C-alpha cells in the first residue's frame, strides 16, 4: 500500500515553515495520542505516522531528501527513524551533506548526479518559501526573497587560490581519483573525496578569505516571478541560483515553495473560484439581479430566478483562474445562502404573519415543504 505523503499527514503545504510544522504536529499528536484514545488501534497507527512524518520534515537534511526522492529516500534504512539513519547515518559515517548527497555519492553518475570523479563539487541546492494572497495567485506577481547562501569569493575570484592561479597539487587523500572507498560491513562503498570535493587536486596556496573553498557565505536578495494560476504548494525552480560551486564548479538551484493565504471572500478549487453570496429572503423568493465581486477585481451581475434556494449555484464562465501552461480558464461559481431576517420591526412581522397565513392556504409554492410532510403522512399511515 502506498504511504501517505508526509505533508498531507501533517496537513501543511510543502512550503511550510519550521514553526508551522511544529504547530501542526503538536495539534495532531495531542488529538491522536494513545492516552486520549485507549484501545483505538487506528488512532495509535495515526499517532505513529504523524511522528514519523514530523521526524523527517523537522530535519532540514531529511526534508531535502524527502522532497527529492519521496519515501524511497528512507526505504533501505527501514524508515526515517531506523538505526541506520541516526547520528549521521550510523554505519555510513563520513558522508558529508544530507541523505540526498548519500544517494548521489553511492550511485553518482548512474543517477545522473552532477558530482563525478575529478570534478569540483557543484553548489548545493537551496530552499525558500514565499506566501502570497489568492488575488496575487490569480494575476501572477513578483516578490523579493532574501536567501542565505554561498557566493563566489571576491578575494580570489572564486579560484580558491591566494594568487588567483590554477596552481594545485594532487590530493593526498584520494591520490587524484576524486573518490575514495570505504569498507562498510560486507560492502565496499565509494564516495566523493572529502578533502578535495571530487576534484582530485587541492589548492597549493589557499585564499585566506575562503580557506581555498572559492566561496564565502552571504545573503542574497532575489526577485521571483510567480506565474498567474499558481497553486498552493507549487515549487518553482530557479536554475543556477543556489549556492556557488567550489572553485568554479557549477552552482546549485534554488527551489521556491509557494503557499497561498486564505481569502475572506473567495475559495479556490483547481482553476475554479467559489463565492458564497447572502440573499435576503424576499430577493430569493421574488428573483432579480444582484452584483457580485469577481476575483479579477471587477464586478459581475447575476440574474437570480424567483424561488432560489440556499445551496443553488450560478456559473460565470471564464471568470476563474488561468490554467498553467494552457490558454484555458476556470469558472466562477456563485453559491447562494438565503438569510432568515432577524430583529423584525412591527410592520415586518405583520407582513410575514400575513404571508404565512396566505402560504398556509395555498397548495403550491413550497414543493420541498409539501413533499416532506407528504412523506411524514405516509410514514404514520403505514404504522
Curated annotation (Swiss-Prot):
Subcellular location: Cytoplasm
Cofactor field: Zn(2+)
GO biological process, one term: DNA replication
Residues noted as binding Zn(2+) 2 in the record, renumbered to the chain: 171, 174, 193, 196
Superkingdom in the source lineage: Bacteria
Signal peptide residue numbers: none
Textual note on the cofactor: Binds 2 Zn(2+) ions per monomer.
Entry's Gene Ontology molecular function annotations: ATP binding; heat shock protein binding; unfolded protein binding; zinc ion binding
CDD domains hit by this protein: DnaJ, DnaJ_C, DnaJ_zf
Domain spans labelled J: 5-70
Residues that hold Zn(2+) 1 according to the record: 153, 156, 207, 210
Ranges annotated as CR-type zinc finger: 140-219
CXXCXGXG motif repeat locations: 153-160, 171-178, 193-200, 207-214
Annotated coiled-coil segments of the chain: none
Keywords: Chaperone, Cytoplasm, DNA replication, Metal-binding, Repeat, Stress response, Zinc, Zinc-finger
Gene Ontology CC: cytoplasm
Subunit details: Homodimer.
Protein purpose: Participates actively in the response to hyperosmotic and heat shock by preventing the aggregation of stress-denatured proteins and by disaggregating proteins, also in an autonomous, DnaK-independent fashion. Unfolded proteins bind initially to DnaJ; upon interaction with the DnaJ-bound protein, DnaK hydrolyzes its bound ATP, resulting in the formation of a stable complex. GrpE releases ADP from DnaK; ATP binding to DnaK triggers the release of the substrate protein, thus completing the reaction cycle.
Protein family (similarity comment): Belongs to the DnaJ family.
PANTHER family, alphabetized: CHAPERONE PROTEIN DNAJ, DNAJ HOMOLOG 1, MITOCHONDRIAL-RELATED
Domain notes: The J domain is necessary and sufficient to stimulate DnaK ATPase activity. Zinc center 1 plays an important role in the autonomous, DnaK-independent chaperone activity of DnaJ. Zinc center 2 is essential for interaction with DnaK and for DnaJ activity.
NCBIfam families: DnaJ_bact, PRK10767.1
Protein name: Chaperone protein DnaJ
Annotated source species: Acidiphilium cryptum (strain JF-5)
Lineage: Bacteria, Pseudomonadati, Pseudomonadota, Alphaproteobacteria, Acetobacterales
Name of encoding gene: dnaJ
